[in-house]
Amino acid sequence: MSSTQKPADVTAERRSHWWWTVPGCLAMVLLNAAVSYGIVRLNAPVTVAFNMKQTVDAFFDSASQKQLSEAQSKALSARFNTALEASLQAWQQKHHAVILVSPAVVQGAPDISREIQQDIARRMRAEP
């Protein structure tokens, strides 16, 4: 009789492990999904809009009011271009963002034009 009881004990032991294995695996899958979601959410870049045309037009309007020679005008344009690129790059790196020009955005992306224009002005004042 002991030989017939032994397989029953092994089967009962396996069932006991089954009840702990399934919830444990489900918990691991849920934890893995939560960690994966968090990693993706933290690393996903933010999309913002920048009105390049308005910024460049404002610069050229301001520059046209000054009496500058052609060489001075070229130097000022080069400084503006350098300040514009540096400002956009710095903002993009600081905020882990994708910057799109305003016409490419239908809605929903915050506009950073004013912030970039202020940074360009600060950079232009700082450079000789």
From Swiss-Prot:
- InterPro entries, A to Z: TrbI_Ftype
Record keywords: Cell inner membrane, Cell membrane, Membrane, Plasmid, Transmembrane, Transmembrane helix
Membrane-crossing segments per the record: 18-40
Q: Which GO terms describe its cellular component?
A: plasma membrane
User: What Pfam families has UniProt attached to this entry?
Assistant: TrbI_Ftype
Source superkingdom? Bacteria
Compartment(s):
Cell inner membrane
User: Which membrane topology term applies here?
Assistant: Single-pass membrane protein
Disruption of the gene: reported phenotype:
Expresses approximately normal numbers of F pili that are unusually long, remains plasmid transfer proficient, displays increased resistance to F-pilus-specific phage. Resistant to phage R17 and M13, conjugates at lower efficiency (about 10% of wild-type), resistant to CdiA-CT toxin.
Q: What does this protein do?
A: May influence the kinetics of pilus outgrowth and/or retraction. Overexpression phenocopies the deletion mutation; i.e. causes resistance to F-pilus-specific phage and CdiA-CT toxin.
What this protein is called in its record is Protein TrbI
Species source reads Escherichia coli (strain K12)
Q: Which gene is this protein's source? A: trbI
